């Protein structure tokens, strides 16, 4: 459908939205819900409970009444209302730029957008995961197989990645056509060599493994172990790219860790 839709929170009638790579917000949400059930003695979490709980959890979104949202000049950012964006492509483009900038900040602001149904509230993301947290996520016992509903069907995309190893998250390329920064941020979080080698070992035991890996890579370009030399400077930066229009002098783009791996 060639139209500018409202937030998926409005269209889907969902109580809570989790965005980005969801491990941290899902753990925080379920832990908070468990604590609520223990404290209240209730048998289940209601829709109202879920909305109330999510308001204090990063990397979630919810739909609120206008009188429920107190604007904080320092920590909030107002987007142009959906109705105004329907009349102006420039305002929609400005919204996209604002969202892109906030997704690239160390200390992002909360985003607010008014719709006919209420105010869409998008809480800022969690801090970048640690290597230990990322290892834990990748070390879970995945089957490495397509969903069972594809049984017997060839999936070209699966053929390309089945013997591939993801070694980091995040991308500081800032390409205009890409939304990786909105999903994963521009700051790189790396898996340990031990975790990567455990996955390589698992791949080597696959029935169709021929003895070579298709690639060791990131979500796009390979930026393993690359980072800002001075993180305090990074905290003040909202550039979508560390390499365009020219490479940032604060970027440590040393390839030695990748070569060692």
What do the predicted segments below correspond to?
Residues 1-115, 122-127:
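Glycine-rich beta-alpha loop elements in corrinoid/cobalamin-binding modules
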Residues 27-30, 131-138, 197, 259:
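Predominant activation on well-ordered alpha-helical scaffold segments within soluble catalytic domains
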Residues 1-10, 140-144, 148-261:
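Conserved Radical SAM active-site core
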Residues 19-20, 27-29, 120-124, 130-133, ...:
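Short helix/loop capping segments that flank catalytic or ligand/cofactor-binding pockets
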Residues 21, 33, 86, 129, ...:
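Detector for methionine-enriched segments
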